[in-house]
Curated annotation (Swiss-Prot):
Belongs to the YejK family. One of its GO terms (molecular function) is single-stranded RNA binding. This is Nucleoid-associated protein YPN_2714. One of its GO terms (cellular component) is cytoplasm.
Length: 334
């Protein structure tokens, strides 16, 4: 992994009671060595693999102003990180889910792009066995479960300040509250809506197929082609590029897919991140609720699975063998 650490600082938040978060500030930057590089490579990998929300700084963002001063050399990185940790404590303390942790600020380069990553990492307790086979307690940073993380694409921010996607953050296991916390700390507003972009893509595909009057099987085959490209991009960690997608797809009528989507006003970006859950709707129907969970290939609709809209009833012809076996055993036990 081509990841080069420029500067990294660690501080700590300690929860004393329900209302108090104390700050412990480090007096120097963390020296870059093999252990630090391995930690950052793992954190970068974990963060890159998770779903993220996008944002951009508000005009009055204190953190953005401080970061600009640091980038210009008017304030050193350590001072920037110490002041930001204080603001982080003030914002985090407002929320009931607030916990202590190690606060990490790392400025690094990856594939010619500069990033600033900010994270609050939890410490976990575990056991270790030494060479004498004695047991002792140990602590480690729970990087794989990190959910309080934000990252600023410094290259994008400085070269394209009008962008709506240079700032990303995780929604976290406690949902929207973590998003709100980061928005407050970063003084940021919501940016690119990834799910909306993906929903717009799906609508554009359906409308394009309908405009060409494709039959059911042809339409589903077209959706499958769209899904194959988008899923490849998702697996590679790359964005969906409309121009490339249009080149991959057969042209229907006089206009290719990119021309059609631009003229019909779907407000799609030239490229945007793939959203796994939304894209799955290209090839599958899925839903759950009331103790029922259903997931089936779209091709099965009107073939083996039939929906009666008037009565809101699904009829399934031919159940999966493992399900049928369970039903037969249950029926036989009565």
């Amino acid at each position: 992994m081509s990841l080069d650490i420029d500067q990294i600082a660690l501080h700590q938040l300690i929860k004393r009671d329900e209302q108090t978060l104390d700050v412990v500030l480090r007096d120097s930057l963390l020296p870059t060595n093999a252990v630090v590089e391995e930690m950052m490579a793992e954190l970068h990998r974990v963060y890159s693999a998770k779903s993220k929300a996008y944002g951009l700084f508000n005009e009055q963002s204190e953190l953005a102003d401080a970061l600009k001063r640091s980038r210009k050399g008017d304030e050193d990185f350590l001072s920037f990180s110490r002041a930001a940790t204080g603001r982080l404590r003030d914002e985090l303390a407002k929320y009931p889910f607030a916990e202590g942790g190690v606060v990490l600020f790392c400025q690094y380069r990856y594939l010619a792009v500069e990033y600033l990553l900010i994270s609050v990492l939890s410490s976990c307790h575990s056991m270790r066995v030494n060479e004498q086979l004695d047991l002792s307690t140990t602590h480690y940073l729970d990087i794989n479960r990190a959910d309080i993380v934000a990252r600023i694409d410094l290259t994008e921010w400085e070269t394209n300040p009008e962008s709506t996607r240079y700032l990303t953050f995780l929604t976290g296991r406690v949902g929207r509250k973590v998003s709100d916390f980061f928005m407050d700390f970063l003084s940021a507003a919501e940016g690119l809506d990834t799910k909306a972009q993906n929903r717009g893509l799906l609508q554009a595909v359906d409308d394009y197929c309908a405009d060409a009057e494709l039959g059911k099987n042809e339409r589903q085959a077209y959706r499958q082609q769209v899904y194959s490209y988008c899923n490849e991009q998702l697996q590679a960690g790359e964005e969906i590029a409309l121009q490339v997608l249009a080149q991959e797809l057969p042209k229907l009528g006089e206009k290719d897919f990119q021309q059609f989507s631009a003229e019909q006003g779907y407000a799609l970006e030239e490229s945007f991140p793939a959203d796994r859950g939304t894209l799955r709707q290209l090839t599958k129907f899925a839903g759950s609720g009331g103790g029922l969970s259903i997931n089936f290939d779209a091709l099965l609709l009107d073939e083996r699975i039939f929906w009666d809209a008037a009565t809101d009833t699904l009829t399934i012809k031919g159940t999966p063998p493992n399900l049928r076996d369970q039903l037969q055993r249950r029926a036989g036990s009565k």
